[in-house]
Amino acid sequence: MSDIAIIHFVNYKRGTRSRAAMRGVMLYVMKEKKTAWEGGPLVSGINCQVQSVYDDFLNTKLLYHKDGGVMFYHMVQSFPKGANIDPRAAHEATRRLAGYFEGCEVLVCTHIDREHIHSHCIINSVNFETGRKVAYGGRTDSGAARSQ
């Protein structure tokens, strides 16, 4: 069996264009019962603080007057059922992956409550360094990132 992770972007039927949706998904992915592991929860912030992640994302949007439209992107990295990977190693692998979203605030949460370990990345749609909106995934760009 292969231990290669699968990565996909979540497509929300209700959308990613509201503050409530952004807050809701952040609260869901940070649930302690899903992220609890030896020594504490598998939750990290890249270019943001876990304790204030919603405010950090929103403040970046407000700073650049980009608080409309797509608010966030949700990427999931899943390891196969029975994969030989430690939850901390899975979390670190996802943190490294999140580091490729240069200039973006990313919330990384690893869930261990299912038969397969998987990590969620909630990515701010506004680059905190440039103030530009970033687009990931979609049907027309084959997963490439583009700035607006």
Locate predicted features.
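N-terminal nicking endonuclease/strand-transfer module with a His-rich metal-binding environment
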Residues: 1-148
